[in-house]
Amino acid sequence: MINREQCGQFIDANTDNMVKDWKRLVEIETGSFDKEGLEEAADTLKAMFEGIGFRCDLIDTGAAGKTLTGILGREREGKPILFSGHYDTVFPKGTLADNPFRIENGRAYGPGVLDMKGGIIIAYYVIKALNSLGFTERPIKILFAGDEEIAHENSTTAETLVEEAKNCEFAFNMETGLPDGSLCVGRKGGITISAEVTGVEAHAGNSFETGRNAIEEMAYKICRLREITNLSEGITVSVGTIKG
């Protein structure tokens, strides 16, 4: 049984090191299309987790950032614990120059500091704390994606996550919690849908009745789609782009 007090003491004693590693990771710019930065971050994380006993693999995702998977204590008897997340950010290369990593009035700033390099560092130090206290009850697994901010387009990262999570006793996604500091125990999913509406061309003056206006039909469908939104159920539908 892990002693919570001892675990907390380990974290407190390593606060400075946590901030240093946090800073180091944030200062590697990892916009979802910055292949060079993503490669550096993936290699950095792989080395960090291998340094605390993990056996890691990097899964190529083509143009996007690689997916890092790893396991510690594969031979342990209990069902695994999984820590997951992503290391890509929404910030383009060069953002760091104007928004460097810094701590002001107890708050950290910088590209990806919250979403979600801070969460990865938390996972890393939680595992280090467990190692220091001799935790051997369960295997510990990690999965950190390099293409989350672009919804894993053209990659199998989502399928890899499902596979890695199978048979796990617990899974912790290291994204941020709620604004009041409380933990979030669920996230809603999302789906992207493309629809094409085709009209019938006709002269608006001479042959109005033979035509079918695709713009009007699309407007009608947008209104119907909006009716699906149900805020009390957490369901939202947003039409983002119209072309034609």
Outline where the language-model segments fall.
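Acidic/His- and Gly-rich active-site-bordering loop/insert found
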Residues: 2-111, 132-135
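Predominant activation on well-ordered alpha-helical scaffold segments within soluble catalytic domains
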Residues: 23, 46, 121-128, 159-162, ...
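Buried hydrophobic positions in well-ordered alpha/beta secondary-structure cores of metabolic enzymes
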Residues: 29, 83-86, 123, 142, ...
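Fold-independent oxyanion-binding glycine-rich loops
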Residues: 85-87, 145-147, 172-177, 195-200, ...
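Short glycine-enriched loops at secondary-structure junctions
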Residues: 87-90, 95-96, 177-178, 187-190, ...
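Glycine/serine-rich anion-binding loops at beta->alpha junctions
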Residues: 91, 107-121, 203
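Acidic/histidine-rich catalytic neighborhood of metal-dependent amide-processing enzymes
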Residues: 116-188
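Acidic-enriched catalytic cores of C-N bond-cleaving enzymes acting on peptides and small amides
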Residues: 185, 207-243
